[in-house]
Amino acid sequence: MQDELFETEKIPPKNTKNTKNAPKKSFEEHVHSLERAIDRLNDPNLSLKDGMDLYKTAMQELFLAQKLLENAYLEHEKLQTPDQKA
């Protein structure tokens, strides 16, 4: 269960409806994907359509990374106050 707090579902291929069986991505994997997207967005030869698609993907990676970071913070806070029930 501890590992589940720090992983999100990897983005499934389009047209995939079952996300419960999707593999999980760690915070670091989200950040790495975001870094790669930023590098690719800096390519002057990137088309507008590809740039917009990449931007959407990057924003999703950022959102998921932030969610994992928030979960880690909440878990840390919970560990700092062990006398309170979760």
Swiss-Prot record:
Molecular functions per Gene Ontology: exodeoxyribonuclease VII activity
Region (Disordered): 1-26
Enzyme Commission number: 3.1.11.6
Catalytic activity of the protein: Exonucleolytic cleavage in either 5'- to 3'- or 3'- to 5'-direction to yield nucleoside 5'-phosphates
Keyword set includes Methyltransferase: no
Record's subunit section: Heterooligomer composed of large and small subunits.
Job of this protein: Bidirectionally degrades single-stranded DNA into large acid-insoluble oligonucleotides, which are then degraded further into small acid-soluble oligonucleotides.
Name under which the protein is recorded: Exodeoxyribonuclease 7 small subunit
Native source organism of the sequence: Helicobacter pylori (strain ATCC 700392 / 26695) (Campylobacter pylori)
Gene, per the UniProt record: xseB
